[in-house]
Curated annotation (Swiss-Prot):
Binding site for Cd(2+) 3: C26, C30, C32, C42
Family: Belongs to the metallothionein superfamily. Type 2 family.
Record note on quaternary structure: Monomer.
This protein's name: Metallothionein 10-Ib
GO molecular function, one term: metal ion binding
Positions contributing to Cd(2+) 6 binding: C54, C66, C70, C72
Chain positions recorded as Cd(2+) 2 binding sites: C19, C24, C39, C42
Binding positions for Cd(2+) 4 per the UniProt entry: C46, C58, C64, C72
Binding site for Cd(2+) 5: C48, C52, C54, C58
Binding-site residues for Cd(2+) 1, renumbered to this chain: C15, C19, C32, C37
Induction: By cadmium.
Function according to Swiss-Prot or TrEMBL: The metallothioneins are involved in the cellular sequestration of toxic metal ions.
């Protein structure tokens, strides 16, 4: 049975309080939906609506920069 915090084994990255960055082993394929990802190497997902692209320095919903008139989550 794989460890629940091991993203490589489970393909699921638990980014909240349940897992520390040490045991998670998140890789490039791991996606997090929050700005508080505690797993090292975990990529935070930032999505802009429509055909808008995220700006530089976007690490999560709180720092997401989209083009004017575009919403971000």
């Amino acid at each position: 049975m794989p460890a629940p915090c091991n993203c490589i084994e489970t393909n699921v990255c638990i980014c909240d309080t349940g897992c520390s960055g040490e045991g998670c082993r998140c890789g490039d394929a791991c996606k997090c939906a929050g700005a508080d990802c505690k797993c090292s190497g975990c990529k935070v997902v930032c999505k802009c609506s429509g055909r808008c692209e995220c700006g530089k320095g976007c690490t999560g919903p709180s720092t997401c920069k989209c083009a004017p008139g575009c919403s971000c989550k």
